[in-house]
Amino acid sequence: MLAESDPEAWGDAIDINLKGVYHGMRAAMPHMLKQGHGTIITISSGAAHNALEGWSHYCASKAGAAMMTKAAHVEGAAKGLRVMGLSPGTVATQMQREIKASGVNPVSEMNWEDHIPAEWPARTLLWMCSAAADPFLGQELALRDEGLRKTVGLI
């Protein structure tokens, strides 16, 4: 709960999920702009758009990163930068086992087989680096979208 949240944990989420994205972009963009091209892909989350109990720090930090991705697209597209985000959804990783054990919100109630395989985000990220993803520049792509899964060749 936000009222009982740990300020240090909140700060860590902002440092990693928001400031980490900022520092990565800030370090790479000058070089990309100088060469006239480059691709930036950020990792978003459905939590950037939907508040979840017990995850205020994660939701807020991911929402900030999603907006930064849009801002980078607005600032860089005309200068040759390709910027977009990927919201992979829930991926079958150790993190999901930890979330399940926490019992905090509806994500913890999901069955293991409801999570997507880790290979799907990896394959999608590679696809996003190609010209085939150009119609999606400036957007956040969600692997929950069956149409995207088909476009990428996952299903």
Please state what every model-predicted region is.
Residues 85-86, 102-151:
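C-terminal helical subdomain
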Residues 25, 61:
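Active-site helix of classical SDR
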Residues 50, 71-81:
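Active-site-adjacent segment of SDR/Rossmann-fold oxidoreductases
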Residues 5, 51-59, 71:
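Active-site loop-to-helix junction immediately N-terminal to the catalytic Tyr of the SDR YXXXK motif
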Residues 1, 27-36:
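A short helix-coil junction within the Rossmann-fold of NAD(P)-dependent oxidoreductases
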Residues 1-2, 6-11:
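Substrate-binding pocket helix/loop in short-chain dehydrogenase/reductase
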